[in-house]
């Protein structure tokens, strides 16, 4: 690495929990060499960088930006656009930036309903005057909520994606090594839009559990069963998103008896992860025998699928911003409960 010009790096969090920044700091000894390869141009989570520090830079002067978090507020949107303008390479880092993640489950309701749930209807809410925050007045430093949570690629052009909630630390090191070498001219640029720090197959292909021909009558909550350490969790009645989720984490959750939650995003060719997961769950349902009447078979399948608690939060936990259908939100060109193709435009 001697003789290299230090590349400039920006890291920013939008609608995020901070876990992606922790993942960057959790890369072990590799962190010690980071400052030799990158000049930190902007990283407000870990140092006292201000908006003007970024705004005053020339456009395109930041070599690499890792942006984590969903686009929830007007300020998030403005920062995404600013960082896109200042950065040569913009990476959607982590599940929130990739697909909206848990914040995007808010897209199941209008903003007004969300505010009412938080400030008026909560079981522990004490708000006798019924004060509900409104749209900040013009010139207010408080950012307004957007009408929906967006992923980063729905508001600006994204060069690459690093999935995960948060990205696994070993994979973060791989991505930093790759992009550092790319910026130094030592390796070719990946294909535009490439998913970095992940595998080409699904979590199931990384999972050591045995996929047997087991059928279930209903799906269980984790507290209802102690799974054995050999058999596929789906076959034991536990919801697992492995069949539809991109690999790269090493199947960390299934290895310890917890179903995959889908944080590495959809596998290759999966357009809607919730639809693919629904099909995977239906495939393990014990739908009776061929001697039963069609109505009886349908009723058994319906009962089994109804045992999946919180279907939206289970099947679209990390992907609601990219869901083909989003309940409760009328969209251009579609009936209530759908989002049209132009719905992400602001």
Please give the residue ranges for each predicted region.
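Iron-sulfur (Fe-S) cluster-binding modules
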Residues: 1-66, 77, 81-89, 108, ...
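Short glycine-rich anion-binding loops that position phosphate/pyrophosphate groups of nucleotides
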Residues: 69-72, 96-98, 167
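Extracytoplasmic/secreted cell-surface and envelope-processing proteins
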Residues: 75-76, 100
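Short gly/pro/ser/thr-enriched loop/turn and capping motifs at secondary-structure boundaries
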Residues: 96-103, 121-122
